[in-house]
């Protein structure tokens, strides 16, 4: 019931009172009726304000949305997110430690994987779909002394479907030895790691390779030191 209809009912009730009621007793009745009318109007106004500003009313939906998820609902949400992530192409290959002549990548070793369309063909990772990819690689070089000036390079290259030229995506050059070696430096061992990583937009069928210029210096003493990977974002 609206405030206007409440006030209209009160006015009709006042008009229905007999004229003789306006005596000494009628005055008290009129006062009570006026007080009742005031309280009724004030209550209706307060109720209207509370409903208008949303203090009370249909807040059940908002309340339900703020309720914490049950363990079953949380598990379903995490499982759905995990399935979406598991559908993306991913590759992580490791180096063959028996070959010192060239850097050969293997996918069937511990901690290596090819998933969701990624392939390793002719020592290159083949991209299965268009999109953004994180491309990364690490190598570790090891040597004994500096009989001569040594330059070590590590490069990640792309053979695109749109053009067959080899293009370097990532590249780094390091030297473990200064140009002028100190006396006795030729007897000291040295280690030189190189890490490369970046995000690139690749196309289906693109081939990626990771190479070094001096594979004979690679250190395979520990697993996880030389690797190459691609992850779809």
Curated annotation (Swiss-Prot):
Residues 1-35 are cytoplasmic. Residues 57-233 are extracellular. The soluble form derives from the membrane form by proteolytic processing. The membrane-bound form is further proteolytically processed by SPPL2A or SPPL2B through regulated intramembrane proteolysis producing TNF intracellular domains (ICD1 and ICD2) released in the cytosol and TNF C-domain 1 and C-domain 2 secreted into the extracellular space. The membrane form, but not the soluble form, is phosphorylated on serine residues. Dephosphorylation of the membrane form occurs by binding to soluble TNFRSF1A/TNFR1. The chain crosses the membrane at residues 36-56. A lipid is attached at residue 19 (N6-myristoyl lysine). Keywords: Cell membrane, Cytokine, Disulfide bond, Glycoprotein, Lipoprotein, Membrane, Myristate, Phosphoprotein, Secreted, Signal-anchor, Transmembrane, Transmembrane helix. It is found in: Cell membrane. Residues 89-233 form the THD domain. SUPFAM superfamilies: TNF-like (SSF49842). Its main location: membrane. Cytokine that binds to TNFRSF1A/TNFR1 and TNFRSF1B/TNFBR. It is mainly secreted by macrophages and can induce cell death of certain tumor cell lines. It is potent pyrogen causing fever by direct action or by stimulation of interleukin-1 secretion and is implicated in the induction of cachexia, Under certain conditions it can stimulate cell proliferation and induce cell differentiation. Induces insulin resistance in adipocytes via inhibition of insulin-induced IRS1 tyrosine phosphorylation and insulin-induced glucose uptake. The TNF intracellular domain (ICD) form induces IL12 production in dendritic cells. This is Tumor necrosis factor. It comes from Marmota monax.
